């Protein structure tokens, strides 16, 4: 019998060994991040507000990008929750889990705000008339607090996702330290109940839509850890769903039953979203009834896509490959660097007035090259590894998890960071990138 500890949710039919890794979730993260880079490069050309724009907007991008926007971030928080449960099970307690999350999330966040985000903020203020070079900006102006050349300082820009994930993880760790057994049991029973019949598709969908609409005209739609109640009303439940799923294997058959009707929901919601987006493009604000319909459709699409993509990850992608581990490890460094890379390359290349396909290829290829260089160099420098989200050294493993668990401990924490979008609204500030209906970035 394996020495691995087996964690079983109430009502589960099989146990989950602590060393077990879901390769499908890794591939899902990797694919989502690849999509993220393409999406953010396309934002330079889309007719929506963003950090830096080409002089020629392309309305043809509205429909495909409108179909991507609603589900990228929710997917990432759900996958993050799943990976966080695996890490918690291996940590041996809430305190170790909290310490691990703080180091692996807050250190890169601090480094990113000090050394990576300033590049993007310099381009932002240059766009509004700032007269000095980057070194002058970083040394004398970046550290101010308040409004400066129309931008708010300080800012974590695209790293807002890391801040949110750190907050959710540390709050969850505190709750688990307080009532861990009760919370795990409650999540397990909720998962067991949702796994019956068609509940998994419809109950969360109705709950998420209700929460979103309840806050729509009450809380402003804006990025901010203490003000983004609309975002938290979606991200927190999905993070907890992923956390529960990792300990409740009985949910996987329910996902398998739900994915086809979920795609039907996605298709219907997509028609609504695109129709409203085309009718009220850019900063145009639709009537309240249509705005509520748009928000409900976005939430429905997000939940449907999560179920469908989780089924794909479980059924077709849950297998290992030589490329999986290096790609999964590269996710977080790529996430930290990719956004400022796009902005800086665009800042210097747009005046060349290249043909659109050449410009797109330059932005995409240049961003991939910069991210790859940072990852390949940074992973070889010991003191730089934790700053770009990599483990400084292999994590010590509890005896109960020693057999078979080492592979997860070395690269599993990077997986929980979901450094992809992973999608996100934070790439632009509240004024420049926030559409009245939803952030685009």
Residue ranges of model-derived segments:
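Alpha-helical transmembrane segments and their immediate juxtamembrane cytosolic regions
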Residues: 2-419, 424, 433-441
